[in-house]
Curated annotation (Swiss-Prot):
The keyword Cytoplasm does not apply. The lineage of its organism: Bacteria, Pseudomonadati, Pseudomonadota, Gammaproteobacteria, Enterobacterales. InterPro entries: DNA_gyrase_inhibitor_YacG, Znf_NHR/GATA. This is DNA gyrase inhibitor YacG. Its cofactor is Zn(2+). Inhibits all the catalytic activities of DNA gyrase by preventing its interaction with DNA. Acts by binding directly to the C-terminal domain of GyrB, which probably disrupts DNA binding by the gyrase. It comes from Wigglesworthia glossinidia brevipalpis. Disulfide bonds: none annotated. Binds 1 zinc ion. Belongs to the DNA gyrase inhibitor YacG family. It holds the Pfam family YacG.
Length: 48
């Protein structure tokens, strides 16, 4: 079955499908989504 293009989760680098029904997209899981949120809150990510 063809689900479309694959991308990598920006946190753990696991491959996920673009068209897959994923509540946590663009992350692969709730854990990766929370890790990303923490990185924003802690100041690791910055907008210039």
């Amino acid at each position: 079955m063809n689900f479309g293009n694959k991308i990598k989760c920006s946190i753990c680098k696991k491959k996920i499908f673009l068209r897959e029904k994923n509540l946590f997209f663009p992350f692969c899981s709730k854990k990766c989504k929370i890790i990303d949120l923490y990185q924003w809150i802690s100041g690791k990510y910055k907008l210039f």
